[in-house]
């Protein structure tokens, strides 16, 4: 269909010169919204609102078609096949530009970017560096991996040409790191978070982070040791618990005896063997009653017979006494 062909043409506009930046490509990488019929008008207003555009790793060979990106402050074009720096004058608000890993041979067409603070041109093919082509507003510049960095006096010349530069090729310019500069840089980084990228972070960030983590670990170890020592010094507290009431053993019919407060408890058996022997010697109460009844009956009978046979009993008694 004609519409599909046109869309494919806009998405990957390939000519003999290479791959160009298109609005369709920008939309594909940086915008997401539902499909509808009136897409062109919506795209127009949305592109105007973009502040960060990522087009890295798309095989782009030429920079162009950025006129609608009026408000962007960060542009990522690394890992492409770009050979020239061009067509950037239309985005004067740009603060962050990454062109690392391309095929650029010359630094040019950057003077219109008066607010540019971060420029990454590492891993390109720049042999001769034209310092007058670099914006004076630069704070961070990375040219690592270019032949021009091997030139005698290269670092001194770049620092002298850029009075605001604070970091060159991942190395801070120590003589320019004053408190005023740090306060100014922190304010700008809060406004533009892209300035907190890997090259900014290497200005002592990881060293400070490692030191802070080490101090935190030492504090935790000290706290654990203090807690351990305090626990070792603490003596256990013994409390007097009330005695539980005695539980009768199996086969014992005697009621449980509760001790009155203030009286000492009677000594108890110290072994199960003694308890067993004592239980065997005890006579039930009902058996004692029957024995006493029989003794009473015998006593009554004896009294009656004694009246009838008194002489004989006396005689027998005398005989026992003589014996």
Curated annotation (Swiss-Prot):
Which ranges does the UniProt record give for the LRR repeats? 49-70, 71-92, 93-114, 115-135
Annotated coiled-coil positions are 203-228
Keyword terms of this UniProt record? Cell projection, Cilium, Coiled coil, Differentiation, Flagellum, Leucine-rich repeat, Phosphoprotein, Repeat, Spermatogenesis
Cite the LRRCT domain residue spans from the record.
146-188
Q: Where is the region Disordered?
A: 252-323
Q: Which residues carry this modification: Phosphoserine?
A: 179, 185-186, 303
UniProt keyword annotation of Coiled coil present? yes
Q: Which domain of life is it from?
A: Eukaryota
Q: Where is the composition biased (Polar residues)?
A: 269-290
Residues bearing PTM Phosphothreonine: 178
Pfam families in the record: LRR_9
Can you say what this protein is called? Leucine-rich repeat-containing protein 46
Q: Which gene encodes it?
A: Lrrc46
